[in-house]
Design a protein with these regions (language model features):
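Long, intrinsically disordered low-complexity tandem-repeat segments
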Residues: 12-34
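Intrinsically disordered, low-complexity regulatory segments enriched in Ser/Thr/Pro
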Residues: 198-228
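Charge-enriched amphipathic alpha-helical scaffolds
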Residues: 67, 77-118, 188-191
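N-terminal trafficking/processing presequences and adjacent post-cleavage segments
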Residues: 5-8, 12, 146-162
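Positively charged, polyanion-binding regions of nucleic-acid-associated proteins
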Residues: 36-69, 79, 152-155
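Amphipathic alpha-helical segments
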Residues: 95-104, 160-176
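Charged low-complexity interaction tracts in eukaryotic proteins
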Residues: 105-143, 186-197, 213-214
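A cross-family detector of function-defining hotspots
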Residues: 163, 169-204
Length: 228
């Protein structure tokens, strides 16, 4: 029997999107993106999926199993509406049904399916479930470099008595160029992010719950949407 794992982290926060969009967009979505795969929305999605699976495997260990990840439509829009200078899709235009079309099996590029596998997509109320097959989990485990920073961060916040000073020192271990700011939104105490690490642009948001510190990480566009 194939095992499954559901992973719904705050990086995939399912908040409300406040923009307006048209349901009448027509055209071949694939024509809107650069011929350079790395500049496409599909490549952005692939990187996000791999990042989250890596984080999950660092937290829970590796198992060759189905993994289900959850994204709000607003996050997926950011991937496909910010995919190069030749992009013709205006911000906020892509509807839930249109996103399902973009992510339909016949539209997925080979570069994506060769790595993460034949993903399956469902959606309800602008919340998308992306099901990664066991082969995708295996690919991430066997063919991508370990994220040593994430592994160390997860181990550190799981340690009794962990402090923000220790967490800040860990960031400095990997880069001298970081930004740390207090947050006063009732949910998080501060964020830390790397300023010149193109492969890690996340906002790492931390909250001290007294007995331990928790974190969630957000893509920059999502962080801006939430208005923290």
């Amino acid at each position: 029997m194939t095992k499954t794992s559901d992973f719904d982290d705050k990086v995939n926060y399912s908040g409300d999107y406040k923009g307006n969009y048209s349901n009448n967009y027509s055209g071949d979505y694939r024509d809107n993106y650069s011929s350079d795969y790395s500049a496409t929305g599909y490549a952005r999605l692939e990187k996000s999926l791999i990042d989250i699976v890596k984080e999950q495997q660092a937290k829970l260990g590796y198992r060759k199993e189905i993994v289900r990840l959850y994204y709000p439509l607003s996050t997926l829009r950011h991937f496909f509406e910010c995919a190069g200078d030749d992009n013709k899709i205006a911000a906020g235009m892509i509807s839930e049904q249109q996103m399902l079309e973009i992510l339909a099996p016949n539209n997925l590029p080979k570069q994506l399916t060769d790595t993460i596998g034949e993903i399956k997509i469902t959606a309800k109320n602008e919340r998308f479930c992306i099901e990664i097959p066991p082969e995708g989990s295996e690919y991430v485990h066997e063919n991508t470099a370990d994220n040593e920073f994430i592994s160390e961060l997860i181990a550190l916040v799981g340690t009794h008595g962990c402090t923000m000073e220790q967490i800040t020192e860990l960031f400095y271990k990997y880069s001298d160029d970081i930004e740390k700011k207090d947050m006063q939104n009732g949910e998080f105490d501060c964020y830390i992010r790397f300023l010149n690490e193109p492969d890690d642009t996340y906002y790492y948001c931390f909250h001290d719950e007294g007995c331990h510190i928790i974190y969630h990480r957000f893509l920059p566009q999502d962080y801006a949407d939430f208005g923290f």
